[in-house]
């Protein structure tokens, strides 16, 4: 699972998901990509599940790039705990994505194989996405 090696602070505010992605919204490495259409938090488990699904489908030949990294800690309070006494402890990591962000890129494979692999990865994501091809 992906997570930062070290961070400056253990806990973060939740923040809000408004606007669109101005960075990381163009294909840089591969020929095909999976692009988000709505804002969300994507967990490191979901990122890894998508990556594994794509790798298993492409087998040899193709190259995959993961363009997002989970750098936001999500805290969770223990079950049946009374209110107060501070914030919970960090439980898992998420990547904050906005509409337009590229999640995965792929190259070195025919379009039909890339489309199939990326659609399987898209089914692992908690949001609507689209398949795009670089010009």
From Swiss-Prot:
It is found in: Plastid, Chloroplast. CDD domains: Ribosomal_L16_L10e (cd01433). The keyword Ribosomal protein applies. GO terms for molecular function: rRNA binding; structural constituent of ribosome. Keywords: Chloroplast, Plastid, Ribonucleoprotein, Ribosomal protein. One of its GO terms (cellular component) is mitochondrial large ribosomal subunit. The keyword Glycoprotein does not apply. InterPro entries: Ribosomal_uL16, Ribosomal_uL16_bact-type, Ribosomal_uL16_CS, Ribosomal_uL16_dom, Ribosomal_uL16_sf. Belongs to the universal ribosomal protein uL16 family. Part of the 50S ribosomal subunit. This is Large ribosomal subunit protein uL16c.
């Amino acid at each position: 699972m992906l997570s930062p090696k070290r961070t400056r602070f253990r806990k973060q505010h939740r923040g809000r998901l408004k606007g669109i992605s101005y960075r990381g919204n163009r294909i840089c490495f591969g020929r095909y990509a999976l692009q988000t259409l709505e804002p969300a938090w994507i967990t490191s488990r979901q990122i890894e599940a998508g990556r594994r699904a794509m790798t298993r489908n492409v087998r040899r030949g193709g190259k995959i790039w993961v363009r997002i990294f989970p750098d936001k800690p999500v805290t969770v309070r223990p079950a049946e705990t009374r209110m107060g006494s501070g914030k919970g402890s960090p439980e898992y990591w998420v990547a904050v994505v906005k509409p337009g962000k590229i999640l995965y890129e792929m190259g070195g494979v025919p379009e039909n194989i890339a489309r199939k692999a990326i659609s399987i990865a898209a089914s692992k994501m908690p949001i609507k996405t689209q398949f795009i091809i670089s010009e």
